[in-house]
Amino acid sequence: MHEHEKRVLEGLLFLSGDEGLSIEQLNGCVEELNKKEIETVLDELMQDYLADVHGIELVRFGGIYKFVSKEAIHPYAQKLFSSTKVATLS
């Protein structure tokens, strides 16, 4: 329903990285949506990313929305980061 808005918010959240963004910050960038509309679109995005086809999900921590890897990815991430450390130390 809100496909354009989803793409915009998704892109902004991706760019924000680990810090994530609040509804207020998103509202400052996407002025054509009010805070309630932004919250609705974020809820839709959260539902979209719950599908098993995605390795990431959209979460909210203390009013901040951000993308994180799903728990099923964590063993692979451990291998990635442990091999990266070994490679940089040698």
Predicted feature residues:
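A short acidic, leucine-rich amphipathic alpha-helix
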Residues: 23-28
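Short basic alpha-helical hairpin corresponding to helix-turn-helix/winged-helix-like nucleic-acid-binding
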Residues: 45-90
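Conserved phosphate/pyrophosphate-binding and hydrolysis machinery centered on Walker-type P-loop NTPases
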Residues: 2, 31, 70
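Short amphipathic alpha-helical interaction segments
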Residues: 33-44
